[in-house]
């Protein structure tokens, strides 16, 4: 009986699952929006939201905890310098998961995972219109 087990296995070994969630966390922190399958998105939320909560209190201990989980210096820097102050007044719920249809090859349900309060990309649109 698998009562009270917290994470989905996602048909992977534990090391593969850890590496996959670490890579997806780094991608989400870097790009602020990623497209993935719905079960992976739901598991990613359980990993990234505690990291952003760590980023709200910039201490050396929290930086080391975040680096231990992410293993990427640039992601940790962005987490504490950009995302922590952005979500300082929000008490949780930093991600939005939007259903995004189904994948063509295997009909897997897809999802768009994005950080809330992202800055708008109006500057890029204005440059495109000017050309």
Swiss-Prot record:
It holds the Pfam family Ribosomal_L17. Transmembrane segments: none annotated. Keywords: Ribonucleoprotein, Ribosomal protein. GO terms for cellular component: cytosolic large ribosomal subunit. It comes from the Bacteria. GO terms for biological process: translation. The keyword Membrane does not apply. InterPro entries: Ribosomal_bL17 (IPR000456), Ribosomal_bL17_CS (IPR047859), Ribosomal_bL17_sf (IPR036373). The keyword Ribonucleoprotein applies. GO terms for molecular function: structural constituent of ribosome. Belongs to the bacterial ribosomal protein bL17 family. Part of the 50S ribosomal subunit. Contacts protein L32. This is Large ribosomal subunit protein bL17. It comes from Paraburkholderia phymatum (strain DSM 17167 / CIP 108236 / LMG 21445 / STM815). The lineage of its organism: Bacteria, Pseudomonadati, Pseudomonadota, Betaproteobacteria, Burkholderiales. The gene is rplQ.
């Amino acid at each position: 009986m698998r009562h009270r087990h917290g994470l989905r296995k996602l048909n992977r070994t534990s090391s593969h699952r850890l590496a996959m969630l670490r890579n997806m966390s780094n991608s989400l922190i870097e790009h602020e929006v990623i497209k993935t399958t719905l079960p992976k998105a739901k598991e990613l939320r359980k990993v990234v939201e505690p990291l952003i909560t760590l980023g709200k209190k910039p201490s050396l201990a929290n930086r080391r905890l975040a680096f231990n989980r992410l293993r990427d210096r640039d992601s940790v820097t962005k987490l504490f310098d950009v995302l922590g102050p952005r979500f300082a007044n929000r008490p949780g719920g930093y991600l939005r998961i939007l259903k995004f249809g189904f994948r063509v090859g295997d009909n897997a349900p897809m999802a768009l995972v994005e950080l809330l309060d992202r800055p708008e990309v109006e500057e890029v649109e204005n440059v495109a219109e000017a050309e």
